[in-house]
Structures are given as structure tokens and as C-alpha cells.
Design a protein with these regions (language model features):
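Hydrophobic positions on the alpha1 helix immediately C-terminal to the Walker A/P-loop
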Residues: 304, 308
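Conserved NTP phosphate-binding and transfer environment spanning the P-loop NTPase/kinase superfamily
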Residues: 286, 409-553
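Glycine-rich phosphate-binding loop used to anchor ATP phosphates in small-molecule kinases
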Residues: 356-414, 464-478
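Hydrophobic anchor at the beta1->P-loop junction of P-loop NTPases
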Residues: 291-293
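Short beta-strand-centered segment that lines the nucleotide-binding/catalytic pocket of NTP-utilizing
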Residues: 314-332
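Auxiliary tRNA-acceptor-end handling modules of aminoacyl-tRNA synthetases
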Residues: 53-72, 95-273, 278, 282-285
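Conserved lysine of the Walker
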Residues: 301
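Conserved nucleotide-sensing/catalytic segment adjacent to the nucleotide-binding pocket
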Residues: 320, 333-376
């Protein structure tokens, strides 16, 4: 007799009895459910699974399409898989590294023994489209890890073999498209025909894989040149080559061999060298009267600002901090968002006329009384603090809007030096699996919110989408305005914060929506061997989040 199990669908709040062992894909057909876009994965008891997944016990299921973050990740991973197969079909024995998110896509380094041409981009794009048009099933396999390692070694995927060796897992999942196998962290689509939209073109010395926009999945994300951002990525690769590691497997191997302290020391020294370089550039521009530092949430811009101030002093420049928090308009004048709530992240929550007026007065040698914002009363009050700039002074202004031209629209451009600080790139899981740098920032924020504000990981994860929307509106559009970009991520970072982040993530209960994200973060942290964060220097940028900094915040 066939065993029936009960499924509760969160999309339509209905229950359904199905045979044990039915796939999520087949359950969706039985539900007769309609989503804005076709389903690409599902939350099963608040854990994201691919539609291959078979259900053997009663479950709560929520189907996800490409307009969700988890859905877009599954779609993108499957595009990576098809790209890698197309490259192997066209250039057997060569490799492709899916490297960095840039220009609303992903930069792919195609190693074919010669410069990549427009013809190569066209050939790979056509090869991908052929695979998609053939509607090839994507099969999921679970095998002993030593068997998977042997398979990947035979294929020349030494980065994957090394990663799997260092995880200590008994079994490993991998996928295949018509005999071409690969390993991916996270759920995948079930058929190549589900990939209805992508773009591929030559970009610098490699390829740019373009993906659908999450806000409008029927269109590709806008192609925006990010030349300064790309140069930072290239610089980071040079640092990785110096350290001899670019993937988690090589990092874990170095940690096992006792090089953790050396990795930390070199990473910190390289970062300090970059900060010193920025300070020297500022000192070389005699017209600069203010340094503007911007970055998204948990980017480490506060510590970056403090360390840059020290380097400015070393160059004979006195940094004078100016807090944008004191320039908020009175609360009743604060703009409201689409929900009718005060939008404190809006540029227009700041008193821009007063800010520009006082800046010009300072630059003209006048004395001004700086404002003081009373956050309890919600209005500006007299501070009694007066300021006059002296020879050798440079104002240092840190805030999310610092790169927005409208913030200092009345200030001559030659007076300004703009710095964008963010966790831009760190390390790859392997050549086909990147780690989103937003995950670095989210983990930093989870730890800091718990330590400094008493917030749970669940609360931080719940608020994160709202934070990201604000960043997309007020920060990222202006990042290319920077005179300098500073990558605040470090190659050892995730291994150092792992021991603090994991216990907080484990406290997120399975019966809440935030569990899926907490589980995903725990899963990718599990790939890293932990390192002792006690050896981090007191000026380390990570200390802003994990504690023990010699700076005051």
C-alpha cells in the first residue's frame, strides 16, 4: 500500500496529500498553483531545496520564483553550470573561473591559452543557448565524498577536490548535464530549458555573464560600467597571488599547515598599505579641504575613517571629523517612505542648505557653531561647539550619502576627495562558486548587532532586505564617483568570525522565515576551518564588529 503524507503549501495556505517520495516539482503540478514567474526552488520547512528534492515526511512548502533572492541564486548557479559545460564543449581541457559580481553580472575568466575575443564570447553564448534549447535534465547525485573527489581530480577540477577534502563530509552532492558533472553550493534548476534569459559578452580580458534583474526578472540587469570597481577586484587578485590562495580549499590547506597567523599579518599589512596610499594621494592634492567616506552597512567605513585619519596625520594633515548625524532636519520635516514611515536614510532627511553653508564658511576661514541633533526630541539644538579651520586641517565626513553629489552640491569639486569603502571581494569557494560579499557584511552586522545592541540574528536577518533596498537607492548608484575605492574584506575574515557567528545563527528557530537565510549562512561557513581571532591586531577592521578594538566607537 502506498504511503500518503500531508503537505502544507504556504503560497496558497492549502494542504495536500501526496505519495511519499514525490518530488517538489511534481507536487507543484498537483497544487495547480500560479506564481508571477515559474518556480525554481522551494523552502521545505524553511530550508531552501531544489525542485529535484523528494518528500518522505509531512512538510511545509513554499515555492519560490526568480523574483526572490533564493530563487535568483538558484537560477544564477544553473547559468554558471551551463556556461561551464559550453566552455568544455568548445574548448576541451580549458578552465573558466566565475569570479566577481560586477556591472549587474559576473566576470568570468576564460583560460584558453590566448586572449579572449568577441568571437569567443559569441561562440560561448551560442553554445549556452544550444544547451538550453535542448531542454536537458539536470540530474542530482549524492555519493561518498572520496568518490566525488576522485571524479573531480580526474576532470582536472583540483580546486573542488581540495575543497571537498578539507570539509570532512561523508557524502557530497553533485550535478550533471548530459554527463558533464560539477559541484555547486546550493539548489539548482531541474532542466536547462528553465533558463529563459541571460546575456554574455566580452568584458575586459574575459566574459561578463549577465543575469535577470530581481526587481524585473523579464529583463536583464542594466549593464553599467564599473571601471574603478573592476580595478579593485584586479588589485585583490594580485594580493591573492601574493598569498598563494584564491579559494577556500587553498586557504584551509594553509591553515592546516600552520600559516594562519602569517595570513592575518600579511592581509592586515596589505590593507594598511592601501590606506597609507590613499592618505598620500590626499596629501598630494593641495586643493583638498574635505575627505568624504561612504560605504554600505557594516562595510567597516568607521574603522577605515579612523585608520585613514592616522595616516593623514603621518602626512602632516590634521583630520577634523564632522558628523552628518548632527545635520538631520527636525523629525516632522523628515521625508516619508511608501509606507508612510519616516525615511531616515533619505538624503533629504539631512539639512543640506545648512551643511553646505557651514562648510563654505569653514573653508573661508570663518568660525561656525556646529549643530547638535537631539534624537530623543527629534530636533536640532544649540551645541555651543564652535569650530574654525586652521592651516593643515582637512574635514573628514563619513556617511552613507558622502559620495552623492547633491550632499555637497555648493562646494567646489577641487575641495573634495571621495573614498568608497566596502567589503568588495574576498575569496571563492572554488572556481565555479563565489561567495557574495553581502554575506560578509551581513555576518559582520549580525555579530555587531548582538554585541552592541542586543539584537538577535533573527532580527538582523529580518531587517536586512530593508537595509539592502536603502543601499541600492542611496549608495551603490554613486560608488563610481569615488576618487579611491577601498576593499575592507580580508581573505581570512570568514574563518575568523565563524566561531562568533555560528552560535548566533543556530539560535534562529526553524519555524520562522529567517531560518532559511540563517541555515544558508551556516552552511557556507561550514566550509571554512576556524582561526583564532585573538591574534588579530587591535586596529584590525574586523575588531569593529567582533570587539577588542583599540579605537572608540
Amino acid at each position: 500500500m502506498k504511503q500518503l503524507i500531508q503537505i502544507r503549501c504556504k503560497n496558497n495556505k492549502k494542504s495536500l496529500k501526496v505519495e511519499a517520495g514525490t518530488t517538489l516539482s511534481d507536487i507543484f503540478k498537483q497544487l495547480n498553483l500560479t506564481l508571477p514567474y515559474p518556480p525554481v526552488c522551494a523552502k521545505v520547512n524553511n530550508k531552501v531545496e531544489g525542485l529535484h528534492y523528494r518528500v518522505y515526511n509531512a512538510k511545509d512548502i513554499e515555492y519560490l520564483d526568480i523574483s526572490s533572492p533564493s530563487g535568483l541564486r538558484a537560477y544564477t548557479r544553473t547559468l554558471f553550470f551551463v556556461l561551464c559545460k559550453a566552455v568544455q564543449d568548445l574548448y576541451p581541457g580549458t578552465t573558466v573561473r566565475i569570479d566577481i559580481p560586477v556591472s549587474n553580472g559576473f566576470y568570468c575568466d576564460l583560460n584558453i591559452g590566448r586572449p579572449v575575443t568577441e568571437a569567443d564570447a559569441t561562440a560561448v553564448r551560442n553554445g549556452m543557448q544550444t544547451i538550453i534549447n535542448r531542454a536537458i535534465p539536470i540530474r542530482r547525485h549524492e555519493v561518498p565524498t572520496d568518490e566525488a573527489i576522485a571524479r573531480f581530480e580526474e576532470m582536472g577540477y583540483h580546486d573542488k577536490a581540495l575543497l571537498l577534502r578539507t570539509t570532512g563530509r561523508l557524502y557530497t552532492l553533485y550535478y550533471d548535464i548530459n554527463g558533464f558533472v560539477d559541484y555547486y553550493y546550493g539548489s539548482m534548476l531541474t532542466n536547462t530549458a528553465q533558463l529563459t534569459l541571460f546575456g554574455l559578452e566580452k568584458y575586459y580580458d574575459g566574459l561578463l555573464l549577465r543575469i535577470p534583474s530581481m526587481s524585473n526578472p523579464s529583463e536583464l540587469g542594466a549593464l553599467i560600467r564599473q571601471d574603478k570597481m573592476f580595478e579593485i577586484f584586479q588589485e585583490h587578485h594580485r594580493w591573492q597571488n601574493l598569498l598563494g590562495m584564491s579559494t577556500v580549499g587553498t586557504f584551509n590547506e594553509a591553515v592546516r599547515e600552520g600559516y594562519a597567523t602569517e595570513i592575518i599579518n600579511v592581509s592586515e599589512a596589505l590593507q594598511e598599505k592601501k590606506i597609507a596610499h590613499i592618505a598620500e594621494n590626499i596629501a598630494g592634492k593641495k586643493t583638498v579641504k574635505m575627505v568624504l567616506i561612504a560605504g554600505p552597512s557594516s562595510s567597516g567605513k568607521t574603522t577605515s575613517c579612523k585608520r585613514l585619519s592616522i595616516q593623514l596625520l603621518c602626512n602632516g594633515i590634521r583630520p577634523v571629523p564632522v558628523s552628518l548625524d548632527d545635520y538631520f532636519v527636525d523629525r516632522e520635516l523628515t521625508p516619508k517612505d511608501e509606507n508612510g514611515d519616516y525615511d531616515f536614510e533619505s538624503l533629504h532627511a539631512l539639512n543640506l542648505p545648512l551643511l553646505n553653508k557651514q562648510l563654505m564658511q569653514l573653508f573661508n576661514g570663518e568660525e561656525v557653531e556646529l549643530p547638535k541633533y537631539d534624537f530623543i526630541k527629534g530636533r536640532s539644538v544649540p551645541s555651543g561647539k564652535k569650530m574654525r579651520m586652521r592651516a593643515g586641517d582637512v574635514l573628514v565626513i563619513e556617511g552613507i550619502h558622502a559620495l552623492n553629489p547633491e550632499l555637497t552640491s555648493q562646494i567646489p569639486e577641487e575641495y573634495k576627495y571621495r573614498v568608497y569603502a566596502s567589503a568588495l571581494t574576498t575569496i571563492l569557494l572554488d572556481d565555479h562558486n563565489y561567495i557574495p560579499t553581502t554575506d560578509n557584511r551581513l555576518l559582520r552586522r549580525i555579530i555587531r548587532d548582538y554585541k552592541q545592541r542586543g539584537c538577535s540574528a533573527r532580527d538582523t536577518i529580518r531587517r536586512w532586505p530593508s537595509v539592502r533596498r536603502g543601499e541600492n537607492k542611496w549608495i551603490f548608484p554613486f560608488q563610481e564617483n569615488a576618487d579611491e575605492m577601498f576593499n575592507t574584506a580580508m581573505i581570512y575574515e570568514l574563518a575568523a568570525i565563524k566561531t562568533q557567528a555560528e552560535p548566533l545563527l543556530e539560535q534562529v528557530p526553524e519555524n520562522c522565515d529567517e531560518y532559511a537565510e540563517a541555515y544558508r549562512l551556516r552552511k557556507f561557513l561550514s566550509y571554512f576551518l576556524p582561526i583564532d581571532h585573538g591574534v588579530l591586531p587591535p586596529t584590525s577592521l574586523l575588531r569593529e564588529f567582533i570587539g577588542g578594538s583599540s579605537f572608540s566607537y
